Amino acid sequence: MLRIPVRKALVGLSKSPKGCVRTTATAASNLIEVFVDGQSVMVEPGTTVLQACEKVGMQIPRFCYHERLSVAGNCRMCLVEIEKAPKVVAACAMPVMKGWNILTNSEKSKKAREGVMEFLLANHPLDCPICDQGGECDLQDQSMMFGNDRSRFLEGKRAVEDKNIGPLVKTIMTRCIQCTRCIRFASEIAGVDDLGTTGRGNDMQVGTYIEKMFMSELSGNIIDICPVGALTSKPYAFTARPWETRKTESIDVMDAVGSNIVVSTRTGEVMRILPRMHEDINEXWISDKTRFAYDGLKRQRLTEPMVRNEKGLLTYTSWEDALSRVAGMLQSFQGKDVAAIAGGLVDAEALVALKDLLNRVDSDTLCTEEVFPTAGAGTDLRSNYLLNTTIAGVEEADVVLLVGTNPRFEAPLFNARIRKSWLHNDLKVALIGSPVDLTYTYDHLGDSPKILQDIASGSHPFSQVLKEAKKPMVVLGSSALQRNDGAAILAAVSSIAQKIRMTSGVTGDWKVMNILHRIASQVAALDLGYKPGVEAIRKNPPKVLFLLGADGGCITRQDLPKDCFIIYQGHHGDVGAPIADVILPGAAYTEKSATYVNTEGRAQQTKVAVTPPGLAREDWKIIRALSEIAGMTLPYDTLDQVRNRLEEVSPNLVRYDDIEGANYFQQANELSKLVNQQLLADPLVPPQLTIKDFYMTDSISRASQTMAKCVKAVTEGAQAVEEPSIC
């Protein structure tokens, strides 16, 4: 794949981790003075007319321009007059010159915009009453502000056949104004060259040329950047208007990135999920699973407590009966006879409440579904299990070594950051593991974990690349640590990171060692002292097992004694609920105010957008009620009190949107030398190799019909490619 030539000079791009469009920093003496409607403003050389206008608060209309995409300059809506210039200019593409006087509201500027708008509306169907973009449409807003009140066009309008690009994005291409935002997003951000234009002039069309699915994990973002109703959401079609919905700022838990989102609800139902700006995490994008899996929140839900009767069937019961049965078991068994497993969607408040409850019965067998090696530094040092460089820090790196991970599907927004740096900053990327399509070129070093030993010893050619780097990153996927030689892999990567710091040009506070997690609850669980993996439970099977949202299938009925009493607390009837003796229905992430910690160690909060269905309750409240019935009441009654307890155990869990600086890398490396384990010859294979593996990874996405349609569409598309029809 060739790198796309982005015209940085026209938009003044810099290599900044905070955003894609930045003006190049220069000394104050190099600033040039321009005037916007007579108002003086000092700007850097290379600043565009549009950026200069925005600096003084003057909004210029635009359709094709987007601050995170390259400049196209083809909609002509941003035309402005430059004093003494013979013609109006495109503000988005024209760099300013010293002394220019930009006239944004002159008669010539107004007439130019009216003319452009008249041509755009000449072929637009004007079907706003049935368009899902109505109420948040740039064409509506700008035609009202900058257009004329009548049209001179009396001929027949152009019509275009709609394209089928998959089960997520609905196309009504007659509405398309050829701004090419979607094409540039696909090529530059998503790294998938599926979209383009065919024809020219009045016959120009945007599409995939041949009918095919838009194969990207970020495809839904073209809905947001489309300025008209040409690209809309298929699952959301004809369901609500934006002014009818209530918007709640929250975060996503479909992966460990912690993307910021807006949950739109109406009448107690989640209608759609949109991205929310956070420059340090997801910028303005979200993954398709984040955006479209919300329909799984209303399917296969646990709405009432259930108990297993004498016939072995689960039947509905009251909260009092269910909690009394569980309380009786907790009173009957103590210590190692009681254990708990936390799943991937559990919040920090529930984790600390469950920890306190089990401590009341003298048990510390608290495990997570995801394995993380405890040998060496293990989870004792926080820097040993975090993405220490941070997500935004990727843009400062000059070399990235990926080990046993496929970030494109395990953490799509992190992968988008890598691609962004590769595209704009000439980042060099290498991979140890199965060859996968990461949307950017990389050096494939092989799939054997023993390559790590060669790099650490300096005998591998890539060792020299790392040595010469000024800001290298080694990113180890948590999926690689699920292997039997996970401790040896972690020790080898830690050794590489330490040797890089000692022998290369790394200076200052730059961190080399990074762990990329896949599930939202893992970092908070490790912060609270949970033991990674369920090996301790397999070795010493308990009499009472508490499954807190554990739907990963890490343990089955066959792994436990026949008389083991299993309690499942969660929000979906997925993998864990069918094996339980008692089911306690909990709340999903859109139904509670809760704390989650992402892979870089940043604590963030979800907010209540809708109420839990039926009799379901927030997880920490269920555990608090259970403790009272069992006669071991936990010392908190409100959410604030629970968070005070969180602060006592791990203060960083309540420092929201803050990252605690990681350290103790040298100590972690010294402890890693104590690991007495050999690397296996088995290849490093991440669990999510293709996009089909991306869509259904947890209880919510597995319950989503939309995600099931995506898997079906990808499967059928792959079969069509493998078995072409013979004419």
Curated annotation (Swiss-Prot):
It catalyses: a ubiquinone + NADH + 5 H(+)(in) = a ubiquinol + NAD(+) + 4 H(+)(out). This is NADH-ubiquinone oxidoreductase 75 kDa subunit, mitochondrial. [4Fe-4S] cluster 1 binds at residues 124, 128, 131, 137. [2Fe-2S] cluster binds at residues 64, 75, 78, 92. It is a peripheral membrane protein. PANTHER family: NADH-UBIQUINONE OXIDOREDUCTASE 75 KDA SUBUNIT, MITOCHONDRIAL (PTHR43105:SF13), RESPIRATORY NITRATE REDUCTASE (PTHR43105). It is found in: Mitochondrion inner membrane. Keywords: 2Fe-2S, 4Fe-4S, Acetylation, Electron transport, Iron, Iron-sulfur, Membrane, Metal-binding, Mitochondrion, Mitochondrion inner membrane, NAD, Oxidoreductase, Respiratory chain, Transit peptide, Translocase, Transport, Ubiquinone. InterPro entries: 2Fe-2S_ferredoxin-like_sf (IPR036010), 2Fe-2S_ferredoxin-type (IPR001041), Mopterin_OxRdtase (IPR006656), Mopterin_OxRdtase_4Fe-4S_dom (IPR006963), NADH_UbQ_OxRdtase_75kDa_su_CS (IPR000283), NADH_UbQ_OxRdtase_ferredoxin (IPR054351), NADH_UbQ_OxRdtase_Gsu (IPR010228), NADH_UbQ_OxRdtase_Gsu_4Fe4S-bd (IPR019574). One of its GO terms (molecular function) is 4 iron, 4 sulfur cluster binding. One of its GO terms (biological process) is mitochondrial respiratory chain complex I assembly. Residues 108-147 form the 4Fe-4S His(Cys)3-ligated-type domain. Core subunit of respiratory chain NADH dehydrogenase (Complex I) which is composed of 45 different subunits. This is the largest subunit of complex I and it is a component of the iron-sulfur (IP) fragment of the enzyme. Complex I associates with ubiquinol-cytochrome reductase complex (Complex III) to form supercomplexes. Interacts with MDM2 and AKAP1. Belongs to the complex I 75 kDa subunit family. Residues 1-23 form a transit peptide. Core subunit of the mitochondrial membrane respiratory chain NADH dehydrogenase (Complex I) which catalyzes electron transfer from NADH through the respiratory chain, using ubiquinone as an electron acceptor. Essential for catalysing the entry and efficient transfer of electrons within complex I. Plays a key role in the assembly and stability of complex I and participates in the association of complex I with ubiquinol-cytochrome reductase complex (Complex III) to form supercomplexes. It comes from Gorilla gorilla gorilla (Western lowland gorilla). GO terms for cellular component: mitochondrial inner membrane; mitochondrial intermembrane space; mitochondrion; respiratory chain complex I. Residues 245-301 form the 4Fe-4S Mo/W bis-MGD-type domain.
